[in-house]
Amino acid sequence: NRTVDRVARSNYTQIFGPHAVNMSGTELVISKYGVKAEWPYQLAKRVKEVAISIEQALVYGKVQEDTSGEVRTMGGLIDFITTNVNSSSTTITEALWLDQMQAVFSAGGSVDRILVGAKQKRVISAFTAGLTVNVNLSDRKRGQVVEVLQSDFGQTSILLDRWLRVSDVFGFSRDQAEVKTLRPLQVEPLAKTGDSVKAQVLAEKTLQFERQSHSFRFSALT
């Protein structure tokens, strides 16, 4: 049967932050060794904290409704990918990897992104050495390196992510996952009180993930 009933999936937006920055008038004008200007330096640190929180939530976020005593949180890849989950294998092999690729192909999909941490990247590199067709150095950003592999199921980009657990590997297609923004990452000035300047850094985003049966993950690797 090629007809598949549509299933409505939902997600919540999550507020990342607000992270406050508060500096006195004295701190604003004095010089500090190694820092040209303290205020933009502190703002940049908070922006980076929010960006890292977003990256982590896109993978490991768990859906939580905004109720009394609970903070509304978004679901990440780990919440959406539920069909092709290998929760028994402790070592990823070429055969297991291709089995997952084939399962997605048989379901009508294709995988062109595999998200891995440092240890599993080395394991995959060992058995895919002959499949490497390109290394895109321009995509190195916040610890990510892109390596394109060729297999029976097409080209797949291996994305190295420093925030992934050793146990996990995720496979999906780039047209399945999209980051949706309700409020972009921003710096909001706060009311000045006394001899100080204040601001907060925040963003509000969520993950839209479609056709989860066209993706896979390993969850018990060591």
Q: Which positions does each model-derived feature cover?
A:
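Flexible, glycine/threonine- and acidic-rich loop/arm segments that mediate assembly and lattice contacts
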Residues: 1-222
